[in-house]
Amino acid sequence: MRDDEATGPLTPGLGRMGSKDPAGISRYNSAIVAIGDELVGGFTLDSNSHWLAERLRLLGYPVKRITAIRDRPEEIVEQLRRELSDPEVTHVFVSGGLGPTPDDRTFASVAQALGREQVIWEETRARIERRVRRMHEAGLLESPDVTEGNLRMARIPAEPAHVFKNRRGMAPGVMYEADGKSIFVLPGVPLEMKGIFTEELEPQFLSGGSAATVRELRFTFAVEARFYPLMRELEEKYPDVSVGSYPNFETKELVIRCLGKDPKRVDEVIEVIRRRSAELGMTGEAR
């Protein structure tokens, strides 16, 4: 879910003002590519991207861009090449399209984008065979034989930097290095994606980030436009702190959110906003 979905629409012409995009605060920046017709068709909520964006922000790998695209190879390849060509993006997270059916085309598309062949990853195939056999013994499958659909999940782009175990499903998570970037290809099933991320990916490959400090002030029945002069002033005086305004027209709240690497600078900005808004007769609640 994007911030404007969580807190309501933005004021036309004012929108989300900031001294710097939060992605610009970190030396690492991420991009998320969510793949699936069910996402862009409005059938399934893209909870994976929302969860990933929050985790990455907390770990110091803030997200520059989230893109949802269809299960179309040419569109997947095009988007991946866009992320690889972006000099600001250091980490790319791809989710979805790793299943056993013909419309699961992510591995093949990643291989094309990276200019690599697809290979059967033997460790993954062996794990799939064991899982299918156990499911047959439990009466969940009629046959203990691995199908072509099962094998699709073991056919990955060649030369992975790391292959993650999926303890909750069959499709593996895979990491690649290309053009100085790290690309993580993860299952679209939320339970599987989160398991791989928290148990292996995060502790092994995301320990070098520096998380931003986040502070908020919440105002009730405040008019967003009244903050415009102050936020423009802060933009000039505190270029290292991102300041954004987020109105929620359902709760009648206006959230002023500040992000920065230096906690003292962020607190200083919050105090300026608190003091100046009080002079205008508005009191913000700290969060």
Which sequence ranges carry the predicted segments?
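Glycine-rich phosphate/diphosphate-binding loop of Rossmann-like nucleotide-binding domains
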Residues: 24-71, 264-267, 271
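Proline/glycine-rich low-complexity loops and linkers
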Residues: 74-75, 88, 105-207
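Short, structured active-site "lid" loops
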Residues: 81-94
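An accessory alpha-helical subdomain
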Residues: 178-276
